[in-house]
Amino acid sequence: MAAVTSEFPSKPISYTSTNTSAKTYYLKSVKKRVTTCFQQLRDKLQSSGSFRKSSSSCLNQIFVRSDFSACGERFRKIFKSARKTELPELWKVPLVAHELTSRQSSQQLQVVARLFSSTQISTKEITYNSNSNTSENNMTIIESNYISVREEYPDIDSEVRAILLSHAQNGITISSIKSEYRKLTGNPFPLHDNVTDFLLTIPNVTAECSESGKRIFNLKASLKNGHLLDMVLNQKERTSDYSSGAPSLENIPRAPPRYWKNPFKRRALSQLNTSPRTVPKITDEKTKDIATRPVSLHQMANEAAESNWCYQDNWKHLNNFYQQASVNAPKMPVPINIYSPDAPEEPINLAPPGHQPSCRTQSQKTEPTENRHLGIFVHPFNGMNIMKRRHEMTPTPTILTSGTYNDSLLTINSDYDAYLLDFPLMGDDFMLYLARMELKCRFRRHERVLQSGLCVSGLTINGARNRLKRVQLPEGTQIIVNIGSVDIMRGKPLVQIEHDFRLLIKEMHNMRLVPILTNLAPLGNYCHDKVLCDKIYRFNKFIRSECCHLKVIDIHSCLINERGVVRFDCFQASPRQVTGSKEPYLFWNKIGRQRVLQVIETSLEY
C-alpha cells in the first residue's frame, strides 16, 4: 500500500462561533413556542363540551372546525417574530460562506499541484490520519493488487523505470508511457485501469500535476541510477507537449510515409540552399563551360545530394570521395539530372506495364525518342553521336572503385537490375535500399511493390526461388545473396527457413549459378527480442556450417562492436514502412551502408 500525503485542512470548515450559537438558540426557542402552543390547544379542547360528546374518530373534524383560525394566527405570529429576529443574520451568512468557499478552492488548487509529488510508498494497512497543526492527510494504495501483474511481467518495473529515466528532463504522461512500452517490448501495456496507482507502487517513481491538468511522471535519483539521471538531465533540453514548456515538434502529427517510388524529386534542395529561383537553368550551350570550369567541393556535394537524398552522417567519406573523383574524373560533358527541378520537363510516352519493351532482347538505339521508352538517365550531348546506356557503365563508385566510366562485358543487360559491379544482388529491402542509395540502381516502373532485378521489397526465401525461375542469366554468374530477414521477422520456424534456404542454393546450382552468400545483419528495431536475435544467430551459424564450400561474407560483424553490441550509429533514427511487407524496417544509414559495401567489395573477386 502507498500513502499519499496532501495538505487538506483536517477539520471541516465551519462558520463563526457567534453564528452557530445564535442559530441553535433560535431553533430551541421555536421548538419551545410550538410545544407551548399545542399544550394550550389541547387544554382548551378538553375543556369544551363538543369534545366530550364527539367520538375519538371525529377528533380531526372537531380540531379543524373549532379552533383553526386561532391556531393559524398563533403559528403566524410565531414565525413572523422569528423571521424578524433572524433576518439580519441571514444576510451575513452567505457572504461569509462565499469567502470561505473561495479561500477553500484556492487552497485546493495549490494542493492538487503537489498532490502526486508528495506520494510515499508503504506496505502498511489503510489508514487515515489527521492533525490540526500540520493539516496533512494520508490515503493509501494497495500494492498487493498488482502482484499478479508483476508475476506475469517480472521486468515491468525496470522497463518502466528505463522509460522514465529517458524522459527525466520533462517527464512523461501515461499515454506516452504506454506507447514507449510497446515500442520497447513489443507488447501492449498490461494495465488499462488504475495506471497511476500502479506506477506509484514502483520505487523512486514520482508524479505531479501540470498546469493543463495532465499527470506527469518522473524518476527520483538513487544510488544506482544517479549518474544516469545526471547524464540525461545534462543533455540538450527538449520540450514536449506534456511538460510546462513550449510544445514539441515530435508529437505533432506527421505526413504519411513516402515510399521510394514516390519522391524521385528529392527535397534536399531546401536544406542545401539551392532553390530553383536562385539556380540558373542549364542549357546545351553552357555544358561545355560547365565541363571545363573547375568545380568546387561544395557544389559537387550538392549535386550528389540532389540525385541521391543520402543522410549527411558520413561527410568524411563524401569529402575524400569527391576530392579523389575531381582528380581522376575525365573531362566530359556533365549530364543533366532528370530528378533536378531545373531540368526541362518533357512529355514521356511510356508503354503500358504489360507491353514494356524487354531490355535484354532489344538492341541499343541512338534516337532520343526511342531512348525515352528505355528509361535513360542522360540526354544527348552536343558533339556526341553515340548514346551510352546506363548498363554500359559501372555503377556509381563506392569505396574501392574510381569515378571513371568503364565498359563492362558481364554487366546485367537491364536499366533496372540491382548489381554491384558485375555481380547481381538478391535480397529484400536491405539490399534494395543499398542498391538504390549507394549504387544508383533504379526501381522497375509500373510495379506496386518496389523491385530492382532480384531485389524485391519484402522478399522471402520462397519468393526468391520463384523469382529466380523467371530470370535468364548466363551460366557461371556470381550472385550476391542476402535473404532470410523477412522470414525471421514474420515468425517462421527456423527449421523451415533452413529447409527453404537449402532448396534455394540447390536450385541455383542446378541453373549453373554461383551464389556468394552473406549472413544476416542485426535487426536494429528487434534487438529487444531475445528469441528473434537468437534465431538470427543460429541461422548465421547454419549458413557458415552448411555452405562451407561456398563463399560467405560476414556483414554481421561490421555492424556490432567488439563486445557484441549493435552499433546503432550505423542505423537510421526510426523504422520505415515498405511496400512489400507490413513489418517496419530500420535501415542502415550512410555509415552502415558504407561499412557493408566495404566488407562485400573486399571479399569479391572474379
From Swiss-Prot:
It is found in: Endosome. Keywords: Developmental protein, Endosome, Phosphoprotein. The keyword Phosphoprotein applies. Capu, spir, and stau are required for the initial localization of osk to the posterior pole. Begins to accumulate at the posterior pole of the oocyte from stage 8 onwards. Signal peptide: none annotated. One of its GO terms (cellular component) is endosome. Residues 152-221 form the HTH OST-type domain. GO terms for molecular function: mRNA binding. It holds the Pfam family OST-HTH. It comes from Drosophila melanogaster (Fruit fly). Transmembrane segments: none annotated. Organizes the germ plasm and directs localization of the posterior determinant nanos. Oskar protein is required to keep nanos (nos) RNA and staufen protein at the posterior pole. InterPro entries: LOTUS-like, OSK, OST-HTH/LOTUS_dom, SGNH_hydro_sf. The modification Phosphoserine is found at residues 270, 275. This is Maternal effect protein oskar. Residues 425-439 are annotated as: Leucine-zipper. One of its GO terms (biological process) is P granule assembly. The keyword Phosphoprotein applies. Interacts with smaug (smg).
